[in-house]
From Swiss-Prot:
This is Enolase. PROSITE patterns: ENOLASE (PS00164). It catalyses: (2R)-2-phosphoglycerate = phosphoenolpyruvate + H2O. Its EC number is 4.2.1.11. Binds a second Mg(2+) ion via substrate during catalysis. The active site is at E205, K337. It is found in: Cytoplasm; Secreted; Cell surface. Pathway: Carbohydrate degradation; glycolysis; pyruvate from D-glyceraldehyde 3-phosphate: step 4/5. Belongs to the enolase family. One of its GO terms (molecular function) is phosphopyruvate hydratase activity. (2R)-2-phosphoglycerate binds at Q163, K337, R366, S367, K388. It comes from Dinoroseobacter shibae (strain DSM 16493 / NCIMB 14021 / DFL 12). Mg(2+) binds at D242, E285, D312.
């Protein structure tokens, strides 16, 4: 039996210098599982609640000592002596202990830290890597990365409205080769931006944050970098966008202030369709606001057979929100962020629901990350086939790419890189 004998949380810092929760779970044989919780900048209104202290005299109110205290108190007491391999039972016990629909009492950051640390401890105790423990013997598909190389929106201090401009190296034969391709484009883009007299400072997720004039300006720079790196856009490498449209949706209109545009929901769909017509865009995330169900339905009707339409703020990794979206014909892909829902069990339920409804899934980081690489294992465990974990800079992003390379190496000849199989 892999019985829990200690649950201990501490306050550490994330990649933006803000406090977050780290949890250690120790089993009776001495096995330790450790997990650190990420945090988002552009957060959906329907996400599980991240508990902050709100003590302005400390970390400007962003401390997590309250969440830490809940882990070290109520949660630890409730889980002591429970078998760590009972993930569903443990997650259910924490949800019941919290007693709210959005984990607002104990905090999703407290609950998730424990949930992931339990899984990692159980995997270690059973002598399995995390991806195999969670995903079983079929867990061998390495995901195509969405590499965020230009940042805008809430992730950068520039006038670009769209939050992320990403590249997807689909022609690679392995995750190691995909990372190499991405790195080569990243370094080429840096040279191109520098030659144009633009900033090569990086944003929260490691992408560049130049003072570009428009979405198309950013896309043109990315295309040029792909070509100069020796690759063919739309063949070797595709483009992906995260609009994070909720961030600029005001009073029923899309206020793209960086470009001086005010768009109705229908005009917003027209805008995105024009981009798809002119650029090799494979995926668009949050092209409409989380509350614009009609806009989402129209976008899916117009582009759903050509482009992957990913729901992030729309679904917040919540099976109930996802079921509503499926019923309304909105989006065809689920972005998976473990801290949006707050437990591993609920995350896996959302992925299963998406797959059963023939939707794709994209495992994702948050803009506030740590060196914890759990999502790399989860991307393989769930056979997502795609992962968003930032650019080719910042160790908090590279930790995930490096873990994927290790997993691929460990799987050997049985490893499969998703590659072109994700194309629509």
């Amino acid at each position: 039996m892999s019985l829990i004998v200690d649950v201990y949380a501490r306050e550490i810092l994330d990649s933006r210098g803000n406090p977050t929760v780290e949890v250690d779970v120790t089993l009776e044989d001495g096995t330790l599982g450790r997990a650190a919780v990420p945090s988002g900048a552009s957060t959906g209104a329907y996400e599980a609640v991240e508990l902050r202290d709100k003590d302005t005299a400390r970390y400007f109110g962003k401390g997590v000592k309250t969440a830490v205290a809940f882990v070290n108190g109520e949660i630890a007491e409730a889980l002591m002596g429970i078998d760590a391999t009972d993930q569903v039972g443990i997650d259910s016990a924490m949800i019941e202990l919290d007693g709210t629909p959005n984990k607002s009492r104990l905090g999703a950051n407290a609950i998730l830290g424990v949930s992931l640390a339990v899984a990692k401890a159980a995997a270690e105790a059973t002598g399995q890597p995390l991806y195999r423990y969670v995903g079983g013997t079929s867990a061998r598909v390495l995901p195509v990365p969405m590499m965020n190389i230009i940042n805008g929106g809430e992730h950068a201090d520039n006038p670009i409205d769209i939050q992320e401009f990403m590249i997807m190296p689909v022609s690679a034969d392995s995750i190691a080769e995909a990372v190499r391709m991405g790195a080569e484009v990243f370094h080429t883009l840096k040279k191109e931006l520098s030659a144009a007299g633009l900033s090569t400072g990086i944003g929260d997720e490691g992408g560049f944050a130049p003072n570009l004039s428009s979405t198309r300006d950013a896309l043109d720079f990315v295309l040029k970098a792909i070509e100069k790196a020796g690759y063919t856009p739309g063949e070797d490498i595709y483009l992906a966008l995260d609009c994070a449209a909720t961030e600029y949706f005001e009073d029923g209109r899309y206020e793209m202030k960086g470009e001086g545009k005010t768009l109705t929901p229908e005009a917003n769909v027209d805008y995105l369709e024009a981009l798809v017509n002119d650029y090799p865009i494979l995926s668009i995330e949050d092209g409409c606001s989380e509350d614009d169900w009609e806009g989402w339905a129209l976008l899916t009707e117009r582009l759903g057979d050509r482009v992957q339409l990913v729901g992030d703020d729309l679904f917040v990794t919540n099976p109930a929100r996802l079921a509503e979206g499926i019923q309304k014909g909105c989006a065809n892909s689920l972005l998976v962020k473990v801290n949006q829902i707050g437990t591993l069990t609920e995350t896996l339920s959302a992925v299963d629901l998406a797959h059963r409804n023939r939707m794709t899934c994209v495992m994702s980081h948050r803009s506030g990350e740590t060196e914890d690489a759990t999502i790399a294992d989860l991307a393989v465990a769930t056979n997502c086939g795609q992962i968003k974990t930032g650019s080719l800079a910042r160790s908090d992003r590279l930790a995930k790419y490096n873990q994927l390379i290790r997993i691929e190496d460990e799987l050997g000849e049985t490893a499969i890189y998703a590659g072109r199989s994700i194309l629509r």
